[in-house]
Amino acid sequence: MSLPAVAVCIPARNEAATIGNIVTEVAELVEQGVVADLVVVDDNSSDATGAIAREAGARVVRSGAGPGKGQALQQAVAATDADVLVFLDADVVNFSAGYVTALTATLLADPARKLVKASYRRPLNGQPEEGGRVTELVARPLLAQLFPELATISQPLAGECALTRDLAERVDFDDGYGIEIGLLIDTHLAYGRNAIAEVELVGERIHRNRPLRELTVHAREVLAAVLARAGTAMPELAELRSGP
């Protein structure tokens, strides 16, 4: 019995500094027969992201839609017929091909699984556990309150995940920062908590950290994605600012 075909899908916008190393690592898995397809969706980059990815060994699809991670991932899913899809972020500085093999192995270990999320340590300013500010201050508290079955997921906003094709074709991807937590909740609602697993990746995940002031949009879109799935109206920004 042959193993399911695995495709690695990487949405990338202006990630020329990191996309080459990531694609090079995954391309080795293609050569080894572990990965069947490697697709980078160049999300209207203004730098050399697409050219670098192609040179490193990826099949590059130029996004025909407006900018947005959800649109890019939908294009990636449509561009391959693989049974298993591995989504990766394009801004990771210390990427390892072990991300792909760990996610894939965990997904295939149980036929009931539909989604496997990555877990890792996220450093900030030299502190090993201080990264993931929106995760700890917004995403996890919201899940604990509104979807308590998902409260044990340590990295609900992780961009690295593996999922089955039937799941990818069943759900709609949010187009903003709510995409990761939206996919997590949608999987839970469609298939149940047992369809979701998490695998710890070795070491720290180092990527581009934004200043605190730039995280407002991220936090708001995560909040909107969770509230929409909980059947709760999104409050106006003025209400959020005024507080109780």
Positions of the model-derived regions?
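Structured catalytic core of nucleotide-sugar glycosyltransferases
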Residues: 1-147, 162-174, 181-244
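Active-site phosphate-binding and catalytic loops of NTP-dependent enzymes
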Residues: 150
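Activation loop
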Residues: 155-156
